[in-house]
Amino acid sequence: MAIPLSLGSAASSAQTLNGGREPLTVDRLYDSPDLAGSSPRQLKLSPDGSRATFLVGRKENLHFYDLWQMDVVSGKVSMLLDASKLQQGELSDEEKARRERQRIYGEGIMEYAWADDGKALLIPSAGKLYYYTLADGKVRLLPTGDGFATDAKLSPKGHYVTFVAGQNLWLLTLANDKLTQLTKDGGGVIKNAMAEFVAQEEMGRMTGYWWAPDESAIAFNRVDESPVEEVTRNEIYADGIKLTQQRYPAAGTANVQIKLGVIALPQQTVTWIDLGQDTDFYLPRVKWLPDSRHLSFQWQSRNQQQLDLRVVDVHSSRAPQTLVAERNNIWINLNDDLHFLKQGGFLWTSERSGFKHIYRFAADGTVTQQLTHGDWTVDSISHVDEKQGWVYFTGRKDSDIEKQLYKVRFDGSEFTRLSTRHGMHQAVFADNKAVYLDYFDSLSQPPQVSLHDAEGKRLAWVEENAVKPGHPLYQYAGLWQLPEFGTLTAEDGQTLHYRLFKPVNFDAHKQYPVLVRVYGGPHAQMVVNSWSSQDYFTQYLLQQGIAVFQLDNRGSGHRGLRFEQVIYQHLAVAEVADQKQGVDYLRTLPWVDANKIAIYGHSYGGYMALMCKLKAPDYFKVAISGAPVTDWSLYDTHYTERYLGNPHDNAEGYRLSSVLPYIGSYQSGLLMYHGMADDNVLFENSTRVYKALQDDGKLFEMINYPGAKHSMRGNKVKTHLYKSLTDFLERQFKLHNH
């Protein structure tokens, strides 16, 4: 049963935005200036809360970023640092891979960090490090030796800069520019102070070292990649083939060996932490306690059904103490919400109730208070104000498809919603002042940034980004369609959210083809009231007379463990059933041409598009699959084993979750594409399907992009891709002149 939701409850009640009615072209979708307007990124508040700083792409080149600032008192916005003043150059292979893991794309200033005293900024650029002092506006190039500096950090009190170069950790003393190599054995299979591939790609841990708050020590991980199978990967570029040796831990194979050490300063002596007898584990998080004497780390079992928070006194020989022992017989999700309180104890989020909520623990690991409750999920802790006794966090209490900002007392009382507008809110707080930045967007509002007081009152716009004359979107806004939201009921009784975009100049007496845009994988949502550049292509299709439907199937994120974990040990069963249910609903609509329903997705969505096409060919006449996983034994350990278990224990689950057993059902109507230098979902995933279809004598279409990685970055690549997808759909649907 479909239950349409009022647009007024989740988005603007208008069907379109206000503005001009110029049609979109594929060439315009990802050209400069960005249709979203000025969308600041890397939002930060200075430690004293006096300045908001952020990166903004240039109008003539949206991927070249400068550093901007706003004076909190006066509201004046100005450029703080012109990135052209910094040396631009070729990135190292390690930095290219690190940015790909972070999904960062661009030039100019891509990251920066405030000094703790608020008087200076550290700015990495193309392997060089720059130190910018606000008092005189001078930029100083720091000495970093001959290597390419990555993962640079200012020490907590601002006396040092640390960075990784040549797979070793280096320390620069700012007072005298003395450069010290802290680790010596990095190189080859040994990586010091660097996060391994799966830590970056799957655990969200991009660093491999951590400063003690008082600058007395640095914790670091030492990674030995020798147990990991080395694969020779062909990165195919337009002008040649690059053979890359990559240590890639495929499901069921060996992971890295990891050690956790502490370097005492200034002595530079190393103490190794006891991580236990089991050597097959993950180290997803490391964090110092405020006293700089105790170090915490999270220890996760290989099967991801055990997650321990352990604490060790780095000045003692005693073994680490386990403060929290999370257990789940399916899997445990990671997060970044651990916060140690200066008054003792800590805050921790857990899904032990079935939904992610905030808990307060005493120093010995006993739960003293559950701060949030209910059948809804907390997204993340945004800020902890110990003086006033507040925890600020984002969550889905009021709607599964929106993210709001809330605060609650340490004792769970005075639960208060601070954000007011419907959409997605992300807050950035100042360390020492009761103000925050609200990064907000919705289907009808491209990203905007505002400054608020601790009660949620807006004090000033940092970037209002209103869609009005002069805004890049304005001339197209009059044709910008907003969707209808609704719900369906899955076969197990759980609620499924969908959104449906009707074509421009919709006529209920006509029939329209429909494209189902899918992701369908864990931790993600597509059916949300948010702005997304992925919707630009949707808007273009709506102007070509193609409706677009999206449904978040079971297994997707922010809905609790029962909703997510139904996929355990067998992928593309519940997910495909739910997408079929979405098509069943579409078939009830008189204006939908049931013979012209296509499905399109990328990455996990590409996998879903293939599985829906092959397992339900009567539902999906056409499929477009981008960079799909097609055989889960080819994908990495941490992600794959979380959902399918170890292939040695679940061989049948792996086989039936693969695309290849279903190839025989294919008849026609498939387009596949893949980046030929993809180091995440390896190109081999697609070539295996190509070969199987060719061996069966089945006709299909494919586009392979030389030099492209998994994210398909770059305007030229995207423009060619979306022109190709449009042409394919128009031919399959027999639209226009095809």
Where are the predicted features?
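Beta-propeller folds
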Residues: I3-L7, A11-V435, L443-Q445, L451-H452, ...
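Serine-hydrolase catalytic core recognition
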Residues: Q42, E229-E230, W272, P284, ...
